[in-house]
Amino acid sequence: MEYKYCENDNFEDFASGRVIYGGTSVPNFPVRLGNEIFRRCLIYKKGKDNLTVYDPCCGGGYLLTVLSMLNPCITEMVGSDIDDSMLQIAERNFSLLSQDGLAKRKQELKELAQKYGKQSHLDALNSLGNLKTLCRSGDFSYRTFHADCTKPIQESLHPDIIITDIPYGNLVSWEGAAESPLNLMYRQLAKMSHEDTILAVIMDKKQKPEANGWLRLEKQQLGKRKFEIYRCLNN
């Protein structure tokens, strides 16, 4: 993997479960790789500021949270998922972009440190101090909603960039359907997009989506996974 737009910095402050809420069933994603893919999407964008970024399989919102912390050009982040328990975690993670949300997390970590005296909680408090500079104020918003991205999405939404990591569990549950749910997802996402919408999908390397409504701009294999980047064909 050749990194063009994201330096090999120390991203330990963004580790899942440290400050950002995580868990055994909560998907995360390599920070540098996610940021590289997002910034490759930016290269193809005509407008590069005040962006609405959407993840239709957001899980606990880890990827969107990290991207919004690292990229001030994102002014609205939107996540949807079919699992309401994941959306609850995503809401908590999205709140970390606000002073109030980060203050609440700081209090939680302080209480854990006082109760258990673990170094990991002290390290998390130190990371929280580092992340505080990435908090947003003013024109920044976030929201989540319940949705099956293979079906019509009722929410009013016009994303500038869509980025999603298709969880392995989704691929397993989608097997055997009359029509590829992955293809259905591409079709539904195209309906809500405009001609300058860029889509990045990370998936199993064996997946071969038809991607109706999208023009592929690039693809790259990552071990057993791959990502593909597209521009919407709507006009």
Task: Identify the meaning behind each predicted range.
Residues 1-235:
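Class I S-adenosyl-L-methionine-dependent methyltransferase catalytic core
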